[in-house]
């Protein structure tokens, strides 16, 4: 798989404008997860952000999204 640098996208979470840099693979996985859950992309990101800020040592938002997606993929693999 060829390497693609991160792509920065802007959005709004809890009334605050923010930008997130993720590799295209993660953007694609995040869009798929949002579609499966019937959520707009910003709502999915907000959900992950809410989980992130409850952590004892919260990671950055981009890292939290990557970790959330990896955990979701691992969970789906275990159930298949």
Outline where the language-model segments fall:
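N-terminal, well-ordered alpha-helical segments
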Residues: 28, 43-46, 63, 67
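Alpha-helix N-cap/helix-initiation sites
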Residues: 19, 41-42, 55-62
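Short, electropositive, low-hydrophobicity segments enriched in small/polar residues
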Residues: 19, 23, 64-67
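Surface-exposed, Lys/Arg-rich phosphate-binding patches that contact polyanionic backbones
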Residues: 25-37, 46-54
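Amphipathic alpha-helical interface segments used for dimerization/assembly
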Residues: 34, 45, 69-73
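C-terminal structural segments of small proteins and small subunits
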Residues: 57-80
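Basic side chains
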Residues: 8-9, 17, 31, 52, ...
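Short Lys/Arg-rich basic patches
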Residues: 2-21
